[in-house]
Curated annotation (Swiss-Prot):
The modification N-acetylalanine is found at residue 2. It comes from Mus musculus (Mouse). It is found in: Cell membrane, Sarcolemma; Cell junction; Cytoplasm, Cytoskeleton. Residues 18-297, 321-432 form the PH domain. Gene3D superfamilies: 2.30.42.10, Pleckstrin-homology domain (PH domain)/Phosphotyrosine-binding domain (PTB). The keyword Zinc does not apply. GO terms for cellular component: anchoring junction; cytoplasm; cytoskeleton; protein-containing complex; sarcolemma; synapse. The keyword Phosphoprotein applies. This is Beta-1-syntrophin.
Length: 537
C-alpha cells in the first residue's frame, strides 16, 4: 500500500500557505524503530499510536488493527481481576478498575498520610508530568507496601502535592525528586481522575518520548498553579504526542548516521530532547523534512515578537534590536565523533550572538555562549569548499572575528539554500550597517616611542594624534584617507603596520594588545564603503 499522500492547504485568513501533511513514519525510541501515524499542522507535529490508525498504513501492515508494539491496546476480560502482564504483587489499572473505585471520591481532593518503609519506600510508581501535559498519576501500587497499607490510594489518583509542595506544575523528574525527599511521614494530596485510566494501563513508545517546552518564566515546582486541576487541559491519550514546532530545530544527519538519507530530526528549543523520524525512502523523507522545516520557519516572526515583548525596551543588551535569528548546525572543533551540534544564532544591530539553547528567562538572553561584535566580524566562506565537499559542506558558511585573544572562527551549516542565502546576506549587511552606526573607533597606541591615539573614522579615514598633556589639545601627527592606504598587516601579537605611501614609509604602531580587532574593523569600514559606492557587483 502506498504512503498516504501529503495534503497541502492554505490556512484561513489569507496568509501564506503552510503544509499540512499526514502519513506513516517510524520513530526511534529506546534504540528501536516503531511505526507511528504523523500529522503535521501549521504549528505542531502529532505522533500517535492508536487503534484504527493502521487504516492509514503505508509502511507495512499493523498487528491486530494497531501498531506501535507495546501500546497496550488489549482490554481485561470482564470478571478477571488481573491481566497477564500485571505481576501478582502489583495493583495496576487492570486490577483497580474504575468501577471499583467509590463514586464519592471521584474528582474530590483527599489527604492521605503514608509512612515510608525502609525497604520499598512509598511503594508506588508514577506517570505523567508537565512535559506530557498531564498531572502526576499513580500508575502502580505495590501490594503490602506503604501506599497499599493505607487502603486509601488508587491507581489513577493524581498527586496534587507532597507535604504541601505543589506538584500540579511539576515535570515527571521533579515529582520523583519531591517524593524521594519527602521524609518518612508523607502527606499526599490526591484526586482520583477516572478519565486517566487508559493512560496508566500501559505505556507506548510514543508516550515515552520526553518533550518539555515550558513558556518563558513559567512557575516551577512549588510555584503553585492558577488553575484548578479539573479545568486544566490535560491530554490522556497515552498513544499520542504533540510537538509544538515553535523554535524547534528541524535538521538531518546530525544525531544519528543516516547512510540511506531516510531520516529527519526535530530538536526541542531547550536542546534536551530529540525526535528522530524515518521514512520508507529518501524522497518521502525529503518531502516531510521540507514541510516541517517550512512550518517551523514560518513561526519565527511570532518568536521575534514574543522575545521583544519579553525583553521590553532594553532589548538583548543596550537597546540592540533583533534583526534575525534561527537554528544552525555548528561544526564541533577537533576530530570529535560528533561533527555538528545545534546552535541558536541571533543577529542584533551590532552583534552576533550564539546560544546552545533557546533562552527561557529574560536574564538568559544576556548570557550567550559567544558574543561577537559585527564590526570585527567577517564572512569568509559560503558554499562548497575546494576539492570534494564533505557532507553538508555545500550549505555551509564560516565567520571570523578579531578578538583580543586572536581570530575566532565558526563554521555553520544551513538546512536549505534559501536559509544559506538569508544568513550570509544578513551577516554581511549587519557588518556594513554596524560600521555606519559606529562611525568611529579610537584606541591607544605607541608611535615612535610616543603615547598616541589611533582613530579610524568611517568617512574620514585614519588619524594618529598625541595624547593631550596638561590640558593641552591633542596634536595630529598623521592624517590619511582610505584611498592612500597601500597595505596593512600585523604580527598577531601587538604590532599594526600601515603603509600610506608617504615619505615616512611603513608606520609601526604598538597597540599594547592583539591587533586583530583593529585589523578586522578596518576591513569592515572598507567593505562597507565599497558596497555603499556600488563597487561590488
Amino acid at each position: 500500500m502506498a504512503v498516504a499522500a501529503a495534503a497541502v492547504a492554505a490556512p484561513a485568513g489569507g496568509g501564506g500557505a503552510r503544509a499540512q501533511r499526514s502519513g506513516l513514519l517510524e520513530v526511534l525510541v529506546r534504540d528501536r524503530w516503531h511505526k507511528v501515524l504523523v500529522n503535521l499542522s501549521e504549528d505542531a507535529l502529532v505522533l500517535s499510536c492508536e487503534e484504527g490508525a493502521a487504516a492509514y498504513n503505508g509502511i507495512g501492515a499493523a498487528t491486530n488493527g494497531s501498531f506501535c508494539r507495546g501500546s497496550g491496546t488489549g482490554h481485561p476480560v470482564p470478571g478477571v481481576a488481573q491481566a497477564p502482564d500485571s505481576p501478582a504483587g502489583v495493583r495496576t489499572a487492570f486490577t483497580d478498575l474504575p468501577e471499583q473505585v467509590p463514586e464519592s471520591i471521584s474528582n474530590q481532593k483527599r489527604g492521605v498520610k503514608v509512612l515510608k518503609q525502609e525497604l520499598g519506600g512509598l511503594g508506588i510508581s508514577i506517570k505523567g508530568g508537565k512535559e506530557n501535559k498531564m498531572p502526576i498519576l499513580i500508575s502502580k501500587i505495590f501490594k503490602g507496601l506503604a501506599a497499599d497499607q493505607t487502603q486509601a490510594l488508587y491507581v489513577g489518583d493524581a498527586i496534587l502535592s507532597v507535604n504541601g509542595a505543589d506538584l500540579r506544575d511539576a515535570t515527571h523528574d521533579e515529582a520523583v525528586q519531591a517524593l524521594k525527599r519527602a521524609g518518612k511521614e508523607v502527606l499526599l494530596e490526591v484526586k482520583y481522575m477516572r478519565e486517566a485510566t487508559p493512560y496508566v494501563k500501559k505505556g507506548s513508545p510514543v508516550s515515552e518520548i520526553g518533550w518539555e517546552t515550558p513558556p518563558p518564566e513559567s512557575p516551577r515546582l512549588g510555584g503553585g498553579s492558577a488553575e484548578p486541576l479539573s479545568s486544566q487541559s490535560f491530554s490522556f491519550h497515552r498513544d499520542r504526542k504533540s510537538i509544538p514546532l515553535k523554535m524547534c530545530y528541524v535538521t538531518r544527519n546530525m544525531t544519528l548516521a543516516d547512510p540511506e538519507n531516510r531520516q529527519l530530526e526535530i530538536h526541542s528549543p531547550d536542546a534536551k530532547h530529540t525526535v528522530i523520524l524515518r521514512s520508507k525512502d529518501s524522497a518521502t523523507a525529503q518531502a516531510w523534512f521540507s514541510a516541517i522545516h517550512s512550518n517551523a520557519g514560518d513561526l519565527l516572526t511570532r518568536v521575534v515578537a514574543d522575545i521583544r515583548e519579553q525583553l521590553g525596551k532594553t532589548g538583548i543588551a543596550g537597546s540592540r534590536e533583533i534583526r534575525h535569528l534561527g537554528w544552525l548546525a555548528e561544526k564541533v572543533p577537533g576530530e570529535s565523533e560528533k561533527q555538528w551540534k545545534p546552535a541558536l544564532v541571533v543577529l542584533t544591530e551590532k552583534d552576533l550572538l550564539i546560544y546552545d539553547s533557546m533562552p527561557r528567562r529574560k536574564e538568559a538572553w544576556f548570557s550567550p555562549v559567544h558574543s561577537y561584535p559585527l564590526l570585527a566580524t567577517r564572512l569568509v566562506h559560503s558554499g562548497p569548499g575546494k576539492g570534494s565537499p564533505q557532507a553538508g559542506m555545500d550549505l555551509s558558511f564560516a565567520t571570523r572575528t578579531g578578538t583580543k585573544q586572536g581570530i575566532e572562527t565558526h563554521l555553520f551549516r544551513a538546512e536549505i539554500s534559501r536559509d544559506l542565502s538569508h544568513w550570509t546576506r544578513s551577516i554581511v549587511q549587519g557588518c556594513h550597517n554596524s560600521a555606519e552606526l559606529t562611525a568611529e573607533i579610537t584606541t591607544a597606541c605607541t608611535y615612535r616611542n610616543q603615547e598616541c591615539r589611533l582613530t579610524i573614522h568611517y568617512d574620514n579615514g585614519f588619524s594618529i594624534s598625541t595624547e593631550p598633556q596638561d590640558g593641552a589639545f591633542p596634536k595630529t601627527i598623521i592624517q590619511s584617507p582610505y584611498e592612500k592606504l597601500k597595505m596593512s598587516s600585523d604580527d598577531g601579537i601587538r604590532m599594526l603596520y600601515l603603509d600610506f605611501g608617504g615619505k615616512e614609509g611603513e608606520i609601526q604602531l604598538d597597540l599594547h594588545s592583539c591587533p586583530k580587532p583593529i585589523v578586522f574593523i578596518i576591513h569592515s569600514f572598507l567593505s562597507a564603503k565599497i558596497t555603499r559606492l556600488g563597487l561590488v557587483a
